[in-house]
Regions:
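Aromatic/hydrophobic pocket-lining residues that form the small-molecule binding cavity
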Residues: 2-6, 35, 171, 264
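Loop/helix patches that line or flank the sugar-binding groove of alpha-linked glycan CAZymes
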Residues: 131-313
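Active-site-proximal helices and loops of the catalytic beta/alpha 8
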Residues: 26-128, 191-265
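Conserved phosphate-coordination/catalytic loops
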Residues: 4, 29, 165-169
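Aromatic- and acidic-residue-enriched carbohydrate-binding clefts of CAZyme catalytic domains
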Residues: 1-4, 8-16, 240, 244-246
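Loop/turn elements at helix/coil->beta-strand transitions in domains of secreted/extracellular proteins
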Residues: 17-21, 46-50, 182-186
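Generic structural signal for well-ordered alpha-helices
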Residues: 10-14, 35-39, 175, 268
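Short acidic catalytic loops
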Residues: 10-29
């Protein structure tokens, strides 16, 4: 019955409301056959439809009736639905539960070959038989925004212009790596201009007593351990007001007041345009990727070590 509800609902939304994409939160809780049937029903109505989900290994069905879950392990057997790659997320900027730990973009040396494998849509923690199986992302609706996690990781208060510039340069590099990676690139809404979920209410400009700490907030500190000016940043904002969840269009468009934000947005826009003009970042098969995407900074040559902070491909 649950499969019938799932398939019929997806087909109805596709037919009646012309929905052309579906993102399953916790898709690994479902069985693969149900998700596949939902995709086939919807794609019969719209062949250009996209379906993706969180393929974390979370299935908890009847152990006496084993099935293939709709998780990352399914990707070697399907080319219809894609999953998010936590591997590229963790290796480039760190992720739950280790947010704030320095990663490749924030000063933490990483295995160059593993970084490159992820750029090729060949994650090291699950097998994908084609690039289209892999959603290449750094940030999404969960956890801190990319801007905020960079600030946390490098311990630089963005209220200082020189720190803000450093954070933006690292964010632009993250966007560059995601938007030139094989597979399907995904950016969090607002990531293109460096969206933040910092609380800028005067009541929270300085640390408050424990009983007044905002729900689902991280207190960020600089390299000396001093709290940021307005130190609270929300990491789970689905039930917060527009004060946290709004899109600050002024930051995205006002070049005079927000030169770094508008520069970051223009950079992302250019990368998206570049990606659309060529198939060089969107090869269809693993064989094509292996034949045509080459690592130039090979560990052991030109002073590049196995774990390093340099990558050229």
């Amino acid at each position: 019955m649950s499969r019938r509800v799932l398939v019929d609902s997806i087909a109805y939304l596709t037919k009646e409301y012309k929905v052309d994409g579906f993102h399953f939160d916790m898709m690994g809780d479902h069985d693969a056959e149900s998700i596949e049937k939902a995709y086939l029903a919807a794609s019969a109505l719209n062949p250009n439809l996209i379906m993706l989900g969180e393929g974390w290994v979370t299935y908890a069905g009847d152990e006496n009736s084993p099935v293939q879950p709709a998780d990352q392990s399914w990707m070697k057997n399907t080319d219809t639905v894609a999953v998010f790659s936590d591997d590229i997320r963790n290796i480039l900027k760190s992720g739950y539960p280790n947010e704030g730990t320095p990663a490749f973009i924030t000063g933490g040396k990483r295995d160059i070959n593993k970084v490159f494998d992820n750029i090729k849509a060949q994650p090291t923690n699950f097998e994908a038989d084609s690039p289209g199986d892999v959603i290449q992302y750094i940030a999404a609706h969960d956890n801190l925004t990319l801007f905020d996690i960079i600030a946390q990781s490098i311990k630089k208060d963005p209220i200082k212009s020189e720190n803000n510039a450093v954070i933006h340069r690292r964010l632009r590099l993250e966007n560059l790596m995601v938007l030139t990676a094989q597979g399907t690139s995904f950016i969090h809404s607002g990531q293109e201009y460096a969206r933040t979920k910092q609380i800028r209410d005067p009541a929270y400009r300085y640390p408050v007593s424990e009983d007044k700490v905002p729900n689902k907030a991280h207190l960020l500190v600089d390299e000396k351990g001093n709290p940021f000016d307005y130190p609270y940043f929300i990491h789970d904002s689905y039930d917060f007001s527009d004060a946290i969840n709004h899109f600050d269009c002024t930051k995205a468009t006002d070049t005079k007041s927000f030169p770094e934000n508008t520069k970051t947005r223009a950079f992302a826009k250019g990368l998206i345009a570049l990606r659309k003009t060529t198939d060089a970042f969107n090869f269809k098969s693993k064989a094509d990727v292996d034949a045509r995407v080459t690592l130039l900074t090979v560990p052991g040559t030109n002073n590049v070590t196995q774990e390093d902070l340099v990558l050229r491909y």
